[in-house]
């Protein structure tokens, strides 16, 4: 079998294997996975000894088989929409009073309700630095081929969700305003600081194909630009403001496979699992509560659904010192990730 046909066969096997793994996963979700071969890119590894070469290192001198590199570049992650919600919001379904006098007994019945986000988007642009340790031996299962990455940059957030998700219905059950409404809350932040850490490891390689894993953590805090509260039935719009920040936390772990399509292009596919959460400042609706004394709010955490998220991307190694990757992901997030870097 010639080398060109072998590369196409590996690419077909890659696509089928990742698709099967994706559809059989019950609850997977996360941020961009990145190319599984990232620790050894953009340089080309030496040819390995074969698919079944179960060799760890062929040198008695471990350091003679190692090489290192330093990478700097740009990392952009842009989420256009996501499936997220606020869960277990207690809503008053009925109120009864008993007893006489000035302090009757009030009994209320509540029901926990989940509220989904109507719209959301996240924009993150960072610079990164990576320290990579590559193994130059022909081992199929390398001891190292590992990369550590630190990122810092800006994060901007936007979301809109039902007003009832932030309502405090239980503070005064007798108030008519405690009934469920059809209002909406819209929150947008300015750019704030975000930082992230990443660890990537190649598990297996044969000189053309790679299997790797990664773990990522991202933490951001963005100052609030505006908060809008309005009701669909009544054309009333209220603006609120806060000096606090909109927090954002996300972690993920992924496994993926990549292969050389030609000497410069490596398509890849990955599956990842993780969690995302964000929370508005506790004083987000202070001014609105002053205007309406019977209108109470409670800030709750926004979390994602348990749904499948899968990533497909391509890395282009233009030279031995420069590369870029474009990745799209679908599932709980609909997003695009762009990474480019220089190796020294």
Swiss-Prot record:
GO terms for biological process: monoatomic ion transport. One of its GO terms (cellular component) is cell outer membrane. It is a multi-pass membrane protein. The keyword Membrane applies. Residues 1-30 form the signal peptide. Transmembrane segments: none annotated. Keywords: Cell outer membrane, Ion transport, Membrane, Porin, Signal, Transmembrane, Transmembrane beta strand, Transport. It comes from the Bacteria. The keyword Cytoplasm does not apply. It is found in: Cell outer membrane. GO terms for molecular function: porin activity. Belongs to the chlamydial OMP family. This is Outer membrane protein B. It comes from Chlamydia pneumoniae.
